Amino acid sequence: MIYSQSELLTLVEQAIVSNRWKREPEGLYAPIEYVLSLGGKRVRPSLVLMACNLFTDDLTEALKAGLAIEVFHNFTLLHDDIMDNADTRRGYATVHKRWNNNTAILSGDAMLIEAYKLLATVKSERFSEILKVFTTTADEVCKGQQYDMEFEKRNDVGLDEYMEMIRLKTAVLLACSLKIGALIGGASEADANTLYNCGINMGLSFQLRDDYLDAFGDPKVFGKNIGGDILCGKKCYLLLSALELAKGDTKSELDSLLALDNATHRDEKINGVIDIYRKLDVDKRCEAQVSAYLLKAMTNLDRLSVPAERLEPLKNLIKAMANRKK
């Protein structure tokens, strides 16, 4: 049986509901319950299930692993929100705003432990390999977050450094999801590694698309105002490309725009920087990279020893993520 994306999403949501964290002390677990109730795309557990379904119809153990990865992912978001001092997540108050910083830190710690407890319930002859992939990935995600924070204080960040940072912060968890699903499903080592590489390329394409949409997305579709990265001086692909390409008067103009005060020159700053992006064809450059990594991900899938029809749900998801409008 080949499961559709909607069928897999239903399985994931049912698993989350059945694993409610209504325990004592309530102050520790209520924030976990809250975070997991806020929804989201559930991309990572869906990838675990899709990868497993390439090789088997039995998704029982993959669902456990998918839930573990989703809990881990939300743990990273919870702690990211503290570091970013974010007010909202998915339209709702963040945990540290609804409760407080100490509660958010401790509940986040508990979520990380819960993720490992859930993973430990997976029955597989390849569990040691599954655990190794998960643990290595968790370590890499932390490294990616640290690099991201360090980049905020640096003015000499290069594109290669940025690509490595987003590989660690974003792409490796997607790759981990695919590989763990494949291992549970009985994939060969070669196929499992190919799916891991697919996840890396998928993740890079996803993050570059996110960078693009922040400046060139339709606010009505994107769901938020454009230019957020510009206002906060985030080292994204667009800005780093512009800083690399800008020369002479264009470089001076870009530097002047970036130095403008957000409160008094918000629109001038956003529109001016976006105009320079267009002048330097940074938007086209970013779109080309999104397409290039999408193609690499698709090429990875075509190398699998799997019937073509089983690949369709995964291919459709990857295309949708790379071409999304929000």
What are these regions (language model features)?
Residues T137-E140, N201-M202, L260-T264, K279, ...:
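A short structural micro-motif
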Residues M1-I16:
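N-terminal leader/targeting segments and the immediately adjacent pre-domain N-terminus
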Residues Y293, S305-K326:
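Short, amphipathic C-terminal "tail helix"
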Residues L239, A297, L314:
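Hydrophobic, well-ordered secondary-structure elements that form the walls
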Residues E7, V17, W21-K251, K319:
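Mg2+-dependent prenyl diphosphate-binding active-site environment of isoprenoid biosynthetic enzymes
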Residues E13, V17, L49, A175, ...:
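An amphipathic alpha-helix signature
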Residues V12, S205, A297-N300, L317, ...:
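Amphipathic alpha-helices that form helix-helix packing interfaces
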Residues K251-L301:
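Mobile late-domain/C-terminal helix-loop "cap" segments
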